């Protein structure tokens, strides 16, 4: 992971100790991409400890998606499961769109 993401051992340790990355025997491409992003942010003074709130926000997003799909999740049929698998990523993308709009709007106020 260190070599693939270009991360220093201490940065990875910080990401693990703050709960941004979960320690594991092996890591997938999603984790490699996340660590690469953490490396890039760290170059600008944004450390793993600063990302805790983002992790908590992501967990709240998942809870919101789960709640919105609760009626489908209670069903056991294949059609409902397929619909959940279709809708969950779409809802996540929409939440990202809203978050992006909030950030873009705030940046425009700061840097007109």
Role assignments for model-derived ranges:
Residues 3-112:
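Arg/Lys-rich, alpha-helical DNA-contact motif
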């Amino acid at each position: 992971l260190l070599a693939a993401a270009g991360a220093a051992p201490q940065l990875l340790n910080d990401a693990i100790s703050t709960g941004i990355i979960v320690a594991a025997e092996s890591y997938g491409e999603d984790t490699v991409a996340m660590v690469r992003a953490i490396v890039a942010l760290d170059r600008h003074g944004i450390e793993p400890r600063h990302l805790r709130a983002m992790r908590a926000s992501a967990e709240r997003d998942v809870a919101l998606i789960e709640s919105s799909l609760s009626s489908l999740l209670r069903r056991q049929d294949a059609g409902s499961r397929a619909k959940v698998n279709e809708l969950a990523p779409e809802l996540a993308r929409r939440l990202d769109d809203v978050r992006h709009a909030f950030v873009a709007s705030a940046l425009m106020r700061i840097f007109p």
